[in-house]
């Protein structure tokens, strides 16, 4: 599937390119699952002592580490240097910094296309040499003849920038994927890409990472954070809410007692349930529940944090449907933008700045007094 995907990409057949990419990814997951079965004592081919599963993992790690050492030695010998050219490595991959190699061999006055072509040529050269080395290692370690094993390294991506903040936490901007020109941001393990981010905050986080990868200064990054924070105050509340589904209203909801305005809840009621019920209560209190739809189980809502208000509501859930003007006006007046920014983005930005060794910019007195860097 990987070969078919590469062929489709070169022919700019993007529909089949995406299909083959999904197929090869699914097959990769299936292969990993097969390897995992060796660690289950209930499988008929396992040994009961994790010997086979440990052998699979340790063999891969050993081959990867040997390949890392080989590539570093090769480049240091060619350039007469003593440095680590492997900037990121996993159990089955490594990312090689080639800027110094390209600049030394071909100069700095290359176009983006020329540079990518030279990188592909150099990657092929390194790949061939490293795979020959794998033949030798396989013979020495496992007594496997060259050409009879399936160990091999293949070039996958070219990146213009790479940010690593810890084990399995990185971001890279990919410009070539298996020989096909692309423009993709690939992130793993970074808080800025977590699933609880709404589209607005996630888009800002992705753009921020791109700007860091493209080498923008701390001053420029600081300004983008400050301007984004100011921009939040001009937006519709739904754009700021945390998107979530509602599943357990009936399980936790206790209707209001006589003379009471708001419902109560059973112990450990989820935040999304409380936010949805508070919206429904407000609809009934304002006698708008006949004109506007209440939130029901299965609906999607946006949870909005509120400042102290006359109803003593801490949050409210807004539905995708039309919201009454009275409730919309109330939410706009009492929406707690600082709290939303802190809960959805500030801590994630704080972690990123800490990883970069930067001091976080002052947004205003209220939002930074509890967050010292």
Where are the regions a protein language model picked out?
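Core alpha/beta catalytic barrel or barrel-like domain that forms the active/cofactor pocket
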Residues: 35-42, 86-95
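Gly-rich Lys/Arg/Thr-decorated short loops/hinges at beta-loop-alpha junctions or inter-strand turns
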Residues: 40-55
